A protein has these predicted regions:
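Basic/polar N-terminal segments that are highly enriched at the extreme N-terminus
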Residues: 1-4, 113-115
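An amphipathic, aromatic/His-enriched active-site/gating alpha helix that lines ligand/cofactor pockets
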Residues: 4, 31-43, 59-96
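Short structural boundary motif marking the start of a folded domain
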Residues: 7-11
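Short, surface-exposed ligand-recognition loops at beta-strand->loop->(often short) alpha-helix junctions
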Residues: 14-27
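Short hydrophobic/aromatic beta-strand micro-patches
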Residues: 16, 57-59
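A short beta-turn/loop motif at secondary-structure boundaries
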Residues: 46-51
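Acidic/histidine-enriched, glycine/proline-rich intrinsically disordered or flexible terminal extensions
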Residues: 94-115
Length: 115
């Protein structure tokens, strides 16, 4: 199902983070993501998996928009803060949305129990 608000370009990033620097990584990622929002990013979420891999799901209007934003922020102290905390970085996975049922915050339907 195509949602008219679905981003056309999505990237999944994955890292192994030095355990003692997880807070530093999360802070750097948050600040770097804020800077990218000011340069065309459509938002991102950071997750830590039960496999101790960290994942970020980022949405963009296009790969060109992503590349332009990353070029403008590549030398930021926030990116350096992240790099210092990374034990291993995996290649990004580029995703094309096919079906979209994510709901914006505050728009969740009522649950079956009437909640």
């Amino acid at each position: 199902m195509k949602n008219p608000h679905t981003p056309q370009f999505v990237v999944l990033y994955r890292w192994k983070i030095k355990p003692e620097l997880e807070d530093q990584f999360a802070a750097g990622w948050s600040q770097a993501t804020q800077a990218l929002l000011e340069r065309g990013s459509l938002g991102s979420r950071l997750h830590k998996g039960n496999d101790d891999t960290w994942y970020a799901y980022a949405q963009w209007s296009s790969n060109a928009a992503r590349e332009k934003a990353f070029a403008a922020t590549a030398d930021s102290p926030h990116q350096a803060q992240m790099r210092e905390a990374i034990l291993e970085s995996f290649p990004p996975v580029y995703l094309e949305p096919i079906a979209d049922f994510l709901l914006p915050p505050g728009t969740a339907p009522k649950t079956f129990d009437g909640g």
